[in-house]
Amino acid sequence: MPSSSAMAVGALSSSLLVTCCLMVALCSPSIPLEKLAQAPEQPGQEKREHASRDSPGRVSELGRASRDEGSSARDWKSKGSRALSGREAWSKQKQAWAAQGGSAKAADWQVRPRGDTPQGEPPAAAQEAISLELVPTPELPEEYAYPDYRGKGCVDESGFVYAIGEKFAPGPSACPCLCTEEGPLCAQPECPRLHPRCIHVDNSQCCPQCKEKKNYCEFRGKTYQTLEEFVVSPCERCRCEANGEVLCTVSACPQTECVDPVYEPDQCCPICKNGPNCFAETAVIPAGREVKTDECTICHCTYEEGTWRIERQAMCTRHECRQM
């Protein structure tokens, strides 16, 4: 056993020696190639080592650069917002100037030419500033539509100016006025009253004038011409007057010749159907006749021929009579 192990060790060592020799023989001519292969790698390795050494500094520089860019972007944004707010304030100022009568100042700044970019604005804001900004001029209030001539003169409706102390009519339907330093002094004259039948009034003059009068009357739902007479009832007669009013009169009935007059539907005054008569107590006595009311009393109705005069009460006389 010891001899076999020794032999095995010797064989192993001899094989190892041979292997080493072969390796040395094979590797000896490749030394310059390895050097040449390692030569270009060394600068790259040095660069990597240099980059690894310089990387913290560069990272810090990049961090600072990014922070600077972020801060500069914020500065651009803040400056842009300030520029936008400045333009809004400027537009409000222009509107205020226009409302105060300084429309000329606002008109000078309505258009901003190209290239007039505010300093420090970001590119987006610069593009907005370079573009033409058309600002509409606000309309002036009504009180500024015409110049104020108070203390200098007076103006009529057509815009004509009159000097102080001059008489003029402010409008086509206005009365004459006197121009004073305090303004027009107008006095309304006393105008005549219009006709009650006037149906068309002309107000183009200082005093209104009647241009047309109605030539008819209206009465109880009917229309009548001027000066026309008409009968409303058997006892009423009416007339359309020139002033448009209707005047009516009631017929005056004469005294009846009887004590029992009768009214007929188509007649205004009563008539005596029984002729002239009078009363003897409750009895009716015809005129001119005697009537015996009882055995001892005779009554007659007084009547004068041609005059139709009668007494209401009959004349009665009582005679002596025999009692049966």
UniProtKB/Swiss-Prot annotation:
One of its GO terms (biological process) is negative regulation of BMP signaling pathway. Keywords: Basement membrane, Extracellular matrix, Repeat, Secreted, Signal, Synapse. Residues 92-107 have a biased composition (Low complexity). Residues 37-126 are annotated as: Disordered. Residues 152-211, 215-273 form the VWFC domain. It is found in: Secreted, Extracellular space, Extracellular matrix, Basement membrane; Synapse. Residues 1-27 form the signal peptide. Pfam families: VWC2L_1st, VWC2L_2nd, VWC2L_C. Its main location: secreted. GO terms for cellular component: AMPA glutamate receptor complex; basement membrane; extracellular matrix; extracellular space; extrinsic component of postsynaptic membrane; glutamatergic synapse; interstitial matrix. The keyword Oxidoreductase does not apply. InterPro entries: VWC2/VWC2L (IPR042979), VWF_dom (IPR001007). Predominantly expressed in the brain (at protein level). It is expressed in the neurons but not the glial cells. The keyword Transit peptide does not apply. A motif (Mediates cell adhesion) lies at residues 114-116. Residues 44-56, 64-78 have a biased composition (Basic and acidic residues). Peripherally associated with AMPAR complex. AMPAR complex consists of an inner core made of 4 pore-forming GluA/GRIA proteins (GRIA1, GRIA2, GRIA3 and GRIA4) and 4 major auxiliary subunits arranged in a twofold symmetry. One of the two pairs of distinct binding sites is occupied either by CNIH2, CNIH3 or CACNG2, CACNG3. The other harbors CACNG2, CACNG3, CACNG4, CACNG8 or GSG1L. This inner core of AMPAR complex is complemented by outer core constituents binding directly to the GluA/GRIA proteins at sites distinct from the interaction sites of the inner core constituents. PANTHER family: BRORIN (PTHR46252:SF4), BRORIN FAMILY MEMBER (PTHR46252). BMP antagonist which may play a role in neural development. Promotes cell adhesion. This is Brorin. It comes from Mus musculus (Mouse).
